[in-house]
């Protein structure tokens, strides 16, 4: 394996990288760095988490050291990714007088203009704000020799394809080296490459990265009305360190977040209507382990680069393979194992098969946890929580009350009563989620109404007996629709058979 020095990186940068713990380049870095140093255009197909920031950032530092004015522009789909890229570049260039600045929306543009006047060598920004500065002429392009597009397909998905064209057209082509990195290569990105890049060197690590055995992929067949209970049962059994949960709509994210909070889980939500300040606050909590469940839409989660995510749950199945790829790519990073679970209605199985066919690998069928598994997991969780409480120093007032209670009651009965109160406080909370009709079968239309479903945990049971439903005018239509989906479920009986006898624990052996 080549080291960074053998790839042509200077001693100063190599020392910095070694101090950061980077002794050997990743595959994408090994293949990209020599071409980047030569000034060749690069088309890299790789996911976030494969070391691609180093693939373009390390050689970029070598090129801008000692230069004056803006030398490079890096485009990123989101503010968070722009900040992460900028921070990593600052780490790579420690002690080398390289200035890196970020420009993105949601922050005062006047402050950014002031920083740009100082002539930083590297500017990292989102397309919209970069265009604002280009139109104001506060971002000078005449000295830019390197343009980098990070997660180009994400920018395209967010509607920035015309913005990317505009920006690429503004930077002089004769002196421009262009590096474009993307997890997928849709037609619009291919057209961008043909129009603006000069005989790019193609670096493709996707096949290996996407097939990474570090991510165990599962699907579980579940009806819409049972989905929330099944999901919380999985949470209790899996006990994820950090989990990202994907919902299809903003409403779904809001309702899921509220439902999880009401059940005692530490969760926050992200979607397009969340303010920038709130978004940064939520991400900070997630990274600092103040919350362990992040509920998000596809758009809100784009560009996130958070280490330590152990589980990804697709509460709503994604509508296309690209979205699925980006979702599960949030886990299984840096050599750590990850788990991705997709909840699928029986009539949505065509989408699972499509994902499997495109990615050329099969997901494992996973049946929902048994009641005994859930209860055991909750008992273990209670014991862990009590153990943590016992390590804290108690207030004298509470110790006095405790002594008085122990004189009056049996200690075992007293503890059991307190624990029962603790458990039932969350179990008795009734949760309401708006019914989301399943995705239509491929080449077929799907009918469905808008209704609401009530979910209640009910002391670990996840059957229908503990579910209370409120009367409403639409109750008769709800029964008709349920019969319709039940008939469809029977048609998919063969799919359900594959789940028999298979548990999450079975797949871990």
From Swiss-Prot:
UniProt GO BP: response to cold; RNA catabolic process
The similarity comment for this entry is: Belongs to the DEAD box helicase family. CshA subfamily.
Residue sites binding ATP per the record? 46-53
Q: Which gene encodes it?
A: cshA
Q: Where is this motif: Q motif?
A: 2-30
Keyword Cytoplasm attached: yes
Can you state the subunit structure given in the record? Oligomerizes, may be a member of the RNA degradosome.
Q: What is its EC number?
A: 3.6.4.13
The answer to keyword Transferase applying to this record is no
- Where is this protein chiefly located? cytoplasm
Molecular function GO terms recorded: ATP binding; ATP hydrolysis activity; RNA helicase activity; RNA strand annealing activity
| Catalytically driven reaction(s) | ATP + H2O = ADP + phosphate + H(+)
Q: Give start and end of each Helicase ATP-binding domain.
A: 33-203
UniProt domain Helicase C-terminal: residue ranges: 214-375
Cited CDD domains: DEADc, SF2_C_DEAD
Keywords assigned by UniProt? ATP-binding, Cytoplasm, Helicase, Hydrolase, Nucleotide-binding, RNA-binding, Stress response
**Motif DEAD box: where?**
150-153
Recorded hits in Pfam families, A to Z, give: DEAD, Helicase_C
Q: Where is the composition biased (Basic and acidic residues)?
A: 483-492
Q: State the protein's purpose.
A: DEAD-box RNA helicase possibly involved in RNA degradation. Unwinds dsRNA in both 5'- and 3'-directions, has RNA-dependent ATPase activity.
Q: Where is the composition biased (Basic residues)?
A: 440-459, 467-482
Instruction: Extract the ranges annotated as region (Disordered).
Output: 440-509
Supply one GO CC term from the record: cytosol
Organism field: Staphylococcus epidermidis (strain ATCC 12228 / FDA PCI 1200)
**Gene3D superfamilies attached to this UniProt entry:** P-loop containing nucleotide triphosphate hydrolases
Q: Its domain of life?
A: Bacteria
Instruction: Indicate what this protein is called per its UniProt record.
Output: DEAD-box ATP-dependent RNA helicase CshA
């Amino acid at each position: 394996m080549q080291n960074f020095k053998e790839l042509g990186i200077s001693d100063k940068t190599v020392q910095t990288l070694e101090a950061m713990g980077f002794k050997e380049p990743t595959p994408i870095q090994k293949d990209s760095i020599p071409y980047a140093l030569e000034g060749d255009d690069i088309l890299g197909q790789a996911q976030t988490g494969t070391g691609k920031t180093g693939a373009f950032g390390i050689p970029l530092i070598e090129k801008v050291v000692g230069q004056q004015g803006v030398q490079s522009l890096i485009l990123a789909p989101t503010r968070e990714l722009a900040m992460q890229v900028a921070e990593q570049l600052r780490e790579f260039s420690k002690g080398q007088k390289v200035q890196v600045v970020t420009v993105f929306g949601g922050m005062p543009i006047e402050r950014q203009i002031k920083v740009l006047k100082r002539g930083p060598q590297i500017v990292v920004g989102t397309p919209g704000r970069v265009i604002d500065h280009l139109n104001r002429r506060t971002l000078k392009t005449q000295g830019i020799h390197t343009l980098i597009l990070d997660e180009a397909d994400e920018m395209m998905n967010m509607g920035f394809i015309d913005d990317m064209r505009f920006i690429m057209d503004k930077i002089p082509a004769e002196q421009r080296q262009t590096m474009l990195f993307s997890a997928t290569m849709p037609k619009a990105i291919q057209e961008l490459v043909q129009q603006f890049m000069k005989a790019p060197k193609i670096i493709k690590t996707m096949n290996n990265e996407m097939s990474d055995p570090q991510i165990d992929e599962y699907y579980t067949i579940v009806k819409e009305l049972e989905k929330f209970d099944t999901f919380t049962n999985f949470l209790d059994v899996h006990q994820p360190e950090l989990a990202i949960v994907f919902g299809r709509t903003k409403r779904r994210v809001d309702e899921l977040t509220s439902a999880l909070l009401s059940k005692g889980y530490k969760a926050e939500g992200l979607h397009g209507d969340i303010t920038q300040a709130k978004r940064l606050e939520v991400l900070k909590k997630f990274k600092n382990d103040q919350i362990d469940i992040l509920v998000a839409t596809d758009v809100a989660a784009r560009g996130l680069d958070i280490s330590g995510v152990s589980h990804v749950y697709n509460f709503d199945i994604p509508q296309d393979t690209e979205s699925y790829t980006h979702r599960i790519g949030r886990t299984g990073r840096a050599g750590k194992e990850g788990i991705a679970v997709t909840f699928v209605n029986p009539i949505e199985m065509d989408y699972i098969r499509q994902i499997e066919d495109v990615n050329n690998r099969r997901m494992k069928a996973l049946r929902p946890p048994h009641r005994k598994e859930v209860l055991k997991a909750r008992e273990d969780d209670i014991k862990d929580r009590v153990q943590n409480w016992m390590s804290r120093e108690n207030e004298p007032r509470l110790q006095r009350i405790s002594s008085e209670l122990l004189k009056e009651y049996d200690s075992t009965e007293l503890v059991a009563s307190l624990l029962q109160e603790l458990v039932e406080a969350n179990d008795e909370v009734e949760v309401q989620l708006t019914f989301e009709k399943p995705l239509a079968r491929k080449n077929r239309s799907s009918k469905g109404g808008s209704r609401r479903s009530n979910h209640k945990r009910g002391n670990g049971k996840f059957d229908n007996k503990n579910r209370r439903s409120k009367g409403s005018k639409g109750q008769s239509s709800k029964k008709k629709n349920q019969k319709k989906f039940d008939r469809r479920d029977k048609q998919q009986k063969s799919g359900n058979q594959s789940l028999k006898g298979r548990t999450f624990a079975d797949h871990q052996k």
